[in-house]
From Swiss-Prot:
<feature type="signal peptide">
    <location>
        <begin position="1"/>
        <end position="16"/>
    </location>
</feature>
<dbReference type="GO" id="GO:0046850">
    <property type="term" value="P:regulation of bone remodeling"/>
</dbReference>
<feature type="compositionally biased region" description="Basic and acidic residues">
    <location>
        <begin position="267"/>
        <end position="278"/>
    </location>
</feature>
<comment type="function">
    <text>Regulates renal phosphate excretion. Regulates bone mineralization by osteoblasts and cartilage mineralization by chondrocytes. Regulates the mineralization of the extracellular matrix of the craniofacial complex, such as teeth, bone and cartilage. Increases dental pulp stem cell proliferation.</text>
</comment>
<keyword id="KW-0964">Secreted</keyword>
<keyword id="KW-0597">Phosphoprotein</keyword>
<feature type="compositionally biased region" description="Polar residues">
    <location>
        <begin position="337"/>
        <end position="346"/>
    </location>
</feature>
<feature type="compositionally biased region" description="Basic and acidic residues">
    <location>
        <begin position="300"/>
        <end position="313"/>
    </location>
</feature>
<dbReference type="GO" id="GO:0005576">
    <property type="term" value="C:extracellular region"/>
</dbReference>
<feature type="glycosylation site" description="N-linked (GlcNAc...) asparagine">
    <location>
        <position position="71"/>
    </location>
</feature>
<feature type="region of interest" description="Dentonin">
    <location>
        <begin position="164"/>
        <end position="186"/>
    </location>
</feature>
<keyword id="KW-0091">Biomineralization</keyword>
<comment type="similarity">
    <text>Belongs to the PF07175/osteoregulin family.</text>
</comment>
<dbReference type="Pfam" id="PF07175">
    <property type="entry name" value="Osteoregulin"/>
</dbReference>
<feature type="region of interest" description="Disordered">
    <location>
        <begin position="166"/>
        <end position="435"/>
    </location>
</feature>
<keyword id="KW-0732">Signal</keyword>
<dbReference type="InterPro" id="IPR009837">
    <property type="entry name" value="MEPE"/>
</dbReference>
Length: 435
């Protein structure tokens, strides 16, 4: 629009006023409406200065002004409308400049309308279906909270006692699961879980004639190491010792809940053999699960006296003869062997039928020869010197200087004699202590 209006304006100027171009004054002022309308005054001045044809120039200027006004009115109007359109576009782009031009009353009315629109918008948001979605969620949550207490009462332990008060899930018709494939029922007087069949679940046989008992230490008030009571159970669902007949070697085993210990009691009176008859009534069931060893009685003194020679006769080269007491070592017997032989030789001068008569004398001589050492080698050397004088003479006659080096069989014979003498001394020491 602006380019069209400017083109029309220039065409009208060139067609309506050709004389203005001749003067040169309007050549630099083309395209300016206000300068073209105001320029007649300097033109009049120029005409007066020249002094030539001044009234003619004035008439011509008036005519030209009238024609200019007639021809310029339309393009000027179109130009004004273009500027107004351009200003409207600027107002849309920059609202702050528009507010500065708008009067205060109009501005207040606009604010009031905006406030009302905001209020209506808030009301629509409150009543909108998108906002109303929160209300059914709240209702659902409250409805879910009403069922929470029932779900919280479900037992976490499957093997615990199932009380009918806590089962609020609607599955009371199904008995609680114990974890091992057996259904349990609740006995309110005991407070524990008992088998559905009292007779079948009373006792499970363990290794023949033994009985197994399930005992709750919290109800009885007994410790884990104490034997629970066998009578007085309420409900009759627990096994007692008197229900089943027990054999001679039977033992009761009780499994205590809450502990890993097994307490048991054995009737020694009913055990086969002599051990059952030797147990006192006070010592029965006193071990509380511990193992007691009952050793046989010590043999009589006649057996000790008669058995000592049998032991000495059967003792080998490397075997140690066992005494009846079993407490004294062989080294202690060797250290005291000399004193024992002296006392026995004084007490029992006629003893020694099973042995040679020179054995005791050899011990006395060995004490004189080996006074500094009581070891096994010293005693063996003493036996070699004094045990067989006839053999020593023969060996000296045969070999001469080689008599000291004897073969091994002779050494074995000497050690056997020494062992027999030591065993006899140990047997005699046991006899003396027994007397």
């Amino acid at each position: 629009m602006q380019a069209v209006s400017v083109g029309l304006f220039l065409f009208s100027m060139t067609w309506a006023a050709p004389k203005l171009n001749e003067d040169g004054s309007s050549g630099g002022n083309q395209g300016n409406i206000h300068l073209a309308s105001v320029k007649p005054e300097p033109m009049v001045g120029k005409g007066t200065e020249g002094g030539r044809d001044a009234p003619l120039h004035l008439l011509d200027q008036n005519r030209q002004g009238a024609t200019l006004l007639r021809n310029i009115t339309q393009p000027v109007k179109s130009l004004v409308t273009g500027t107004e359109v351009q200003s409207d576009r600027n107002k849309e782009k920059k609202p702050q400049s528009v507010l500065s031009v708008i009067p205060t009353d109009v501005h207040n009315t606009n604010d009031y309308s905006e406030d009302t629109e905001n209020q209506q918008r808030d009301l629509l948001l409150q009543n909108s279906p998108g906002q109303s979605k929160h209300t059914p969620r709240a209702r659902r949550s409250t409805h879910y909270l009403t069922h929470l207490p029932q779900i919280r009462k479900i037992l976490s332990d499957f093997e615990d006692s199932a009380s009918p008060d806590l089962l609020v899930r609607g599955d009371n018709d199904v008995p609680p699961f114990s974890g091992d494939g057996q259904h349990f029922m609740h006995t309110p007087d005991r407070g524990g879980a008992v088998g559905s069949d009292p007779e079948s679940s009373a006792g499970h046989p363990v290794s023949g004639s033994s009985n197994v008992e399930i005992v709750d230490p919290h109800t009885n008030g007994l410790g884990s190491n104490e034997i629970p009571g066998r009578e007085g159970h309420i409900g009759g669902a627990y096994a007692t010792r008197g229900k089943t007949a027990q054999g001679a070697g039977s033992a009761d085993v009780s499994l205590v809940e809450g502990s890993n210990e097994i307490t048991g009691s054995t009737k020694f009176r009913e055990l086969p053999g002599k051990e059952g008859n030797r147990v006192d009534a006070s010592s029965q069931n006193a071990h509380q699960g511990k193992v007691e060893f009952h050793y046989p009685q010590a043999p009589s003194k006649e057996k000790v006296k008669g058995g000592s020679r049998e032991h000495t006769g059967k003792a080998g080269y490397n075997e140690i003869p066992k005494s009846s007491k079993g407490g004294a070592s062989k080294d202690a017997e060797e250290s005291k062997g000399n004193q024992v032989t002296l006392t026995e030789s004084q007490r029992f001068p006629g003893k020694g039928k099973g042995q040679s008569s020179h054995s005791l004398g050899n011990e006395v001589k060995s004490e004189e020869d080996s006074s500094n050492s009581l070891s096994r080698e010293g005693i063996a050397i003493a036996h070699r010197r004094t045990s067989h004088p006839t053999r020593n003479r023969g060996m000296s006659q045969r070999r001469g200087s080689w008599a000291s080096r004897r073969p091994h069989p002779h050494r074995r014979v000497s050690t056997r004699q020494r062992d027999s003498s030591e065993s006899s001394s140990s047997g005699s020491s046991s006899e003396s202590s027994g007397d």
